[in-house]
Amino acid sequence: MVGPEIERLIQLLSRLPGLGPRSARRAALRLVEKRESLLVPLAQAMADAAARVRTCSVCGNFDTIDPCAICADHRRDPSMLCVVEDVAGLWAMERTGSFKGRYAVLGGLLSALDGVGPEDLGIESLVARALDPAITEIILATPATVEGQTTAHYVAERLAPCNVTVSGLAHGVPVGGELDHLDDGTITAALRARRVF
């Protein structure tokens, strides 16, 4: 049996993605065991983040400044805008180091089952940004799911009157992927998106 403080720590940790009750218990134990080197610095970092991190008013990214460092970076290509579902998608794109434009975070995907409609997402601000003559291409980087593709099609329709090229990420075989390990949908998408050598 553990005290209420540790139990609360375990319960809160178990709410994090990828941490179930058992993993949360192990993480809490490690934090308590390494109080000075882990728990105290983590608590301070979390308090700092809670106090300072905000949502960028331009793109929807999280940062301690507004506009965020990406939006404020004049070295980035202002003609390209990448539309992502959420900040995790933005961070994934940034991790690759291959996209040098700017972003628009939708804040979710259209989902009739979950009651998420166009008015719940950042589509209107995206359309307003698309009217900027400096923007020439908008890349829809939504997930290859039913909701992701539905959202991409809806956004593409909304952007049709704007004077921009709307493109989407290619779908298909990942680098290093073997065909016998892929699902039918991925193989079909790869076949449709094939290219000439």
UniProtKB/Swiss-Prot annotation:
CDD domains: TOPRIM_recR (cd01025). GO terms for molecular function: DNA binding; zinc ion binding. A zinc finger (C4-type) spans 56-71. Pfam families: RecR_C, RecR_HhH, RecR_ZnF, Toprim_4. One of its GO terms (biological process) is DNA recombination. InterPro entries: DNA_Rcmb_RecR, Rcmb_RecR, Rcmb_RecR_Znf, TOPRIM_dom, TOPRIM_RecR. Residues 79-174 form the Toprim domain. Keywords: DNA damage, DNA recombination, DNA repair, Metal-binding, Zinc, Zinc-finger. It comes from the Bacteria. The keyword Metal-binding applies. PANTHER family: RECOMBINATION PROTEIN RECR. May play a role in DNA repair. It seems to be involved in an RecBC-independent recombinational process of DNA repair. It may act with RecF and RecO. NCBIfam families: recR. Belongs to the RecR family. This is Recombination protein RecR. It comes from Paramagnetospirillum magneticum (strain ATCC 700264 / AMB-1). The gene is recR.
